[in-house]
Amino acid sequence: MSTPARKRLMRDFKRLQQDPPAGISGAPQDNNIMLWNAVIFGPDDTPWDGGTFKLSLQFSEDYPNKPPTVRFVSRMFHPNIYADGSICLDILQNQWSPIYDVAAILTSIQSLLCDPNPNSPANSEAARMFSESKREYNRRVREVVEQSWTAD
């Protein structure tokens, strides 16, 4: 059955394959267009450099009118990422707009890695460290990056 959400996701997938943003990949899981796996590579020349971070995106039939549920599957240490991998990002909540596609969502999350918002912490320890001890914060991020190489 082809619904508006499924048609839109097929378009998003085609666009992502034809013109992938740097450091991002994503595709539907098996034969389910409503459930995607994605990978964000840590941006160059940042503490996240070299990391490979896996995410899952769950879409509803209300997409693109409602945002997907996005979670990091990889372990993360970041002010705006909860312990369960869910992400505190305005475009995934109150600032969502149907103009955002999968590429825009993943690009925004990649940007968030390097530009956290410590005023809206999902991980208070990471937010405190980011604000008070950038060196220690960067060390913890590097640990997460190294773990991303061996995680399955």
From Swiss-Prot:
GO-annotated biological processes: protein ubiquitination; ubiquitin-dependent protein catabolic process; vegetative to reproductive phase transition of meristem
The GO molecular function terms of this record are:
ATP binding; ubiquitin conjugating enzyme activity; ubiquitin-protein transferase activity
Q: Which residues form the UBC core domain?
A: 4-150
Q: In which tissues is it expressed?
A: Expressed in all tissues examined. Lower levels found in leaves.
Q: Which domain of life is it from?
A: Eukaryota
The EC number(s) given in the record are 2.3.2.23
Q: What pathway, per the record?
A: Protein modification; protein ubiquitination
List the catalytic activities from the record. Answer: S-ubiquitinyl-[E1 ubiquitin-activating enzyme]-L-cysteine + [E2 ubiquitin-conjugating enzyme]-L-cysteine = [E1 ubiquitin-activating enzyme]-L-cysteine + S-ubiquitinyl-[E2 ubiquitin-conjugating enzyme]-L-cysteine
What Pfam families does the record point to?
Answer: UQ_con (PF00179)
**Keywords linked to the UniProt accession:** ATP-binding, Nucleotide-binding, Transferase, Ubl conjugation pathway
Q: What turns on expression? A: Not induced by heat shock.
Note the PROSITE patterns from the entry. Answer: UBC_1, UBC_2
User: Which residues of this protein are catalytic?
Assistant: 88
What family does this belong to? Belongs to the ubiquitin-conjugating enzyme family.
Query: What is the role of the protein in this entry?
Result: Accepts the ubiquitin from the E1 complex and catalyzes its covalent attachment to other proteins.
Protein name, per record = Ubiquitin-conjugating enzyme E2 2
| Organism of provenance | Arabidopsis thaliana (Mouse-ear cress)
